[in-house]
Amino acid sequence: RSVSRGLGDVYKRQPYIQRAITPILKQRVSTSKCMLLVGARQVGKSTLIKHEFKDFNRANFDDRLTRMQAKEEPKLFFLNNPQPLFIDEVQKESSILEDIKQIVDESDERGMFILSGSQKLELMKGMSESLAGRVSISELTGLSMREIYGVKFNRHFIPTDAYIKEREKEIVKYDNIWEIIHKGSYPELYDIDRDWQEYYSSYVATYLERDINELVAADGITFTKFLTAVAARTGELLNYSNIAGDVGVSEPTIKNWISILERTGIVYPVSYTHLRAHETLSD
């Protein structure tokens, strides 16, 4: 038997939406000296950490003065921000990773640092160079359907009768699928008072200001035009030349900008080899 829940029921839930990855993160924090949580801006990284790890102090590298102190006076920075410490947007001052390495190497404690950031590839590279073997890495994406509808069942699929019977206890009929697809999966959009068009307008402005200005030399209007062109091609085969023609820049520039969208968690390219593998399995 299934239970039908509409989005009205979703909006009435408590402001914080329980994330399925939480038990994994708690386990990793308890067994690792340092944990890194990556994911695009506003998927809920900071909210999750602040809600689930309340004993951690917090430093946010979106703040310029905080970054400056971490870079120029790391000893004073750690004196002002003792462990356990959560450092948000750590990729903005990656030099601190060397200081973190020194601290964790001098201690046997677990759960000393939680780091988060929205530039996945830069962080992975920095971790492999500075904190290899000392950090556990997890990725947070947007809300899943189970998270949106408050389904507590959170086990990976196993083709057994026992799994099916347990899963049937919480079967939910998802209403308004197309509305959810159109709206997206950012947690803030599931606040009943949030206008999604205004939200995405602000999101793009923040993304251009905080991330793109640091990664690419392009004016905001041209890059916004590029974002629009890419969004219109969601689910299609990627044609760099076609996008370059629409935006009015070179094909190499488009390739570079696509890689930036991937690095910041905005797009997820699927390689043609994956598509071919799926076709082979289907055959």
Regions found by a protein language model. Give the residues of each.
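Conserved small/polar residues in nucleotide/adenosyl-binding loops
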Residues: 6-14, 273-280
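Pre-Walker A adenine-sensing motif
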Residues: 16-28
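Hydrophobic anchor at the beta1->P-loop junction of P-loop NTPases
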Residues: 37
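Conserved lysine of the Walker
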Residues: 45
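Hydrophobic positions on the alpha1 helix immediately C-terminal to the Walker A/P-loop
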Residues: 48
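Conserved catalytic/switch belt of AAA+ P-loop NTPases
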Residues: 98-114
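Short regulatory helix/loop adjacent to the ATP-binding pocket of P-loop NTPases
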Residues: 122-135
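Interdomain hinge/linker elements that couple catalytic modules in large macromolecular machines
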Residues: 150-276
